Swiss-Prot record:
PANTHER family: GROUP 10 SECRETORY PHOSPHOLIPASE A2, PHOSPHOLIPASE A2 FAMILY MEMBER. Disulfide bonds join C39-C96, C53-C142, C55-C70, C69-C124, C75-C149, C76-C117, C85-C110, C103-C115. The keyword Lipid metabolism applies. The active site is at H73, D118. The lineage of its organism: Eukaryota, Metazoa, Chordata, Craniata, Vertebrata. This is Phospholipase A2.
C-alpha cells in the first residue's frame, strides 16, 4: 500500500527538478506515474502527494472521495508484484496524445501491467473532481477500516 505513496513523494522531487518534462516517447521506471498524471489530468502530480487518505505518505482508512484513487493504484501495484514485477524500477515506454496515455504496443507482461495500473489511476484522477479540502487531509481522520483490494 505504501508503494503509491513513496512513488508520489519521489514524483514531487522529480517534478520540482524538471524531470516531468517528457519527450513524446518516454522510458523512466518509477517516475512514469507522475508524467501520466500530468498527461491525463493537466495537473502537477504534486497536487496528489498528500491528498485524502491514500495519495501521499502512508495510507489507511477509507478513501475520502473519488479523487482519492491511490488505494486502487496500490492494489494494482500489489498484484503486479505478485506477478514478479518490480513496481519501483521496471520501466515502460508510453506517449501522451490529447490527454490520453498510449502504451498498448508493449510486449513485456510487467510493462503492460504497470502501464495499466498507472493509466487507470490517472483516468480515475481525471474523472474525479478535485476537492481542495482533502489536500493535506490528516491521517487521524481516515479511520481504521480499509477497503479490500477485491472491491476493484
Amino acid at each position: 500500500m505504501a508503494a503509491c505513496h513513496r512513488i508520489l513523494l519521489l514524483l514531487s522531487v522529480a517534478v520540482a527538478s524538471g524531470a516531468a518534462q517528457k519527450p513524446p516517447l518516454t522510458k523512466r521506471g518509477l517516475l512514469e506515474f507522475g508524467g501520466i498524471i500530468t498527461c491525463s489530468t493537466g495537473r502537477s502530480p504534486l497536487s496528489y502527494v498528500m491528498y485524502g487518505c491514500y495519495c501521499g505518505l502512508g495510507g489507511k482508512g477509507w478513501p475520502r472521495d473519488k479523487a482519492d484513487c491511490c488505494h486502487e493504484h496500490d492494489c494494482c501495484y500489489g498484484e503486479a508484484e505478485t506477478l514478479g514485477c518490480q513496481t519501483k524500477t521496471d520501466q515502460y515506454r508510453w506517449k501522451c496524445e490529447d490527454k490520453k496515455v498510449e502504451c498498448d504496443d508493449l510486449n513485456d507482461k510487467c510493462e503492460k501491467f504497470l502501464c495499466k495500473c498507472d493509466r487507470d489511476a490517472a483516468k480515475c484522477l481525471e474523472k474525479a473532481p478535485y476537492n481542495q479540502k482533502y489536500l493535506f487531509w490528516p491521517s487521524f481522520m481516515c479511520g481504521s477500516e480499509e477497503p479490500k483490494c477485491s472491491i476493484y
